[in-house]
Amino acid sequence: MEKIKEKLNSLKLESESWQEKYEELREQLKELEQSNTEKENEIKSLSAKNEQLDSEVEKLESQLSDTKQLAEDSNNLRSNNENYTKKNQDLEQQLEDSEAKLKEAMDKLKEADLNSEQMGRRIVALEEERDEWEKKCEEFQSKYEEAQKELDEIANSLENL
C-alpha cells in the first residue's frame, strides 16, 4: 500500500514536471513567434528602405547624367569649368554614399532573411518537440489514470476483506 502511494506520488510529480516543461516550451514558442514577427517587420522596414534607396539611386543617377552633360558643356565654357567640376564631384560622392547605404541595407536585408529562415526552422523544431512532449504527457496521463484505477480497485478489494 505504501509503495503504491509512493508510486502515485512519483507519477504525480512526474506529471507535474511534464506539465511544467510543456508550459516552458509553449512560452518559448510564443517568444519565437514574436521574434519571428519582429524579424518580418524588420524585413518589411528594410525592404521599404531598400525601395527608397533604389529611388534615390535612380534620382542620383539621373542627376549624375545631367551633371556629365553639364561637364561636357563646361568644356566649351572655361569660366564655368570649376563650378561644374565641383558639382560633379559632389554628386558622385552622393552616389557613392547612396550606393554604400544601399549595400548596407541589402546586407541587412540578407541577414534578416537568414535570421527569419533560421527562426522558422527553429520554430518547426520546437513545435515538433512540443508535440512529442504533449504525446508523452498524454501517455503519462493515461498511465496515471490506469494506476489510479488500479489503486481504487486495490482499495476496494482491501475494504471488502
Swiss-Prot record:
Stretches for region Disordered: 32-97
Keyword Phosphoprotein attached: yes
Biological process annotations from GO: actin filament bundle assembly; actin filament organization; cellular bud site selection; mitotic actomyosin contractile ring assembly; mitotic cytokinesis
Subcellular location: Cytoplasm, Cytoskeleton
Coiled coil stretches, renumbered: 1-161
Cystine crosslinks: none
Bias (Polar residues) ranges: 62-83
Keywords from the UniProt entry: Coiled coil, Cytoplasm, Cytoskeleton, Phosphoprotein, Repeat
A single MF term (Gene Ontology): actin lateral binding
Predominant location category: cytoplasm
Keyword Phosphoprotein: yes
Compositionally biased region (Basic and acidic residues): 32-43
GO cellular component term, pick one: actin filament
Notes on the domains: The molecule is in a coiled coil structure that is formed by 2 polypeptide chains. The sequence exhibits a prominent seven-residues periodicity.
Note, other: Present with 11100 molecules/cell in log phase SD medium.
Subunit structure: Homodimer.
Function comment: Involved in cell morphogenesis. Binds to F-actin and stabilizes the actin filaments.
This protein's name: Tropomyosin-2
Organism: Saccharomyces cerevisiae (strain ATCC 204508 / S288c)
Taxonomic classification: Eukaryota, Fungi, Dikarya, Ascomycota, Saccharomycotina
